[in-house]
Amino acid sequence: HVGHPEGYTATDIVARYKRMNGFNVLHPMGWDAFGLPAEQYAIQTGTHPAVTTNKNCDTFRRQIKELGLSYDWDREINTTDPKYFRWTQWIFIKLYNTWFDHKTNRGRDINELPIPLDVVKAGDEARKKYIDSKRLAYYDDAQIWYCPSCRIVCANEEVLTDGSHEKCGNRVVRRNLKQWMLRIPYYAERLLSGLDSLDWPEGIKEMQRNWIGRST
């Protein structure tokens, strides 16, 4: 839709201006192609999501080139490319195998986690449970917003004030769901203080502060 080229044109103007002034400009394009909309469209059309996703990427690429935007296509990325998502999997595994040391205020390898003596005496199952309770990435029950119409989990930002789903307009409900969680609050203060040194518009930084929040 028209909103895409509007934003792309603005960054392309800056990229072209910087190039003409002798800067080495990194101006790639990529596709955030994983997601529930892609899955749902594949279900509705009876087509494998890889087929529909690749077709959409090809269409976007063709349209962007027709607009004459100066992206570096040698650096094109696609989140469904194994060469790309292997690194997101690698990051998740790193989080899973890390615990947060409050004394040093940083993450450490899970193999360095001190195990209390009473836990050791309780046996292997208790030891595993204790270790899992300290991982930065852990599996737990949590309340989520669920849209019965779309059959998907909704982010808080997708739920309107009247309790409806912004995408379909139908009511959402609260459900308990087993899911992966991250201990982001442990890093909240560091993330918040890091915003102060960024040369970003204050409105964007305030938005980030609201997203990060603080551990209470």
Enumerate the language-model features and the residues they cover.
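N-terminal, positively charged nucleic-acid-binding surface of large information/translation enzymes
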Residues: 2-216
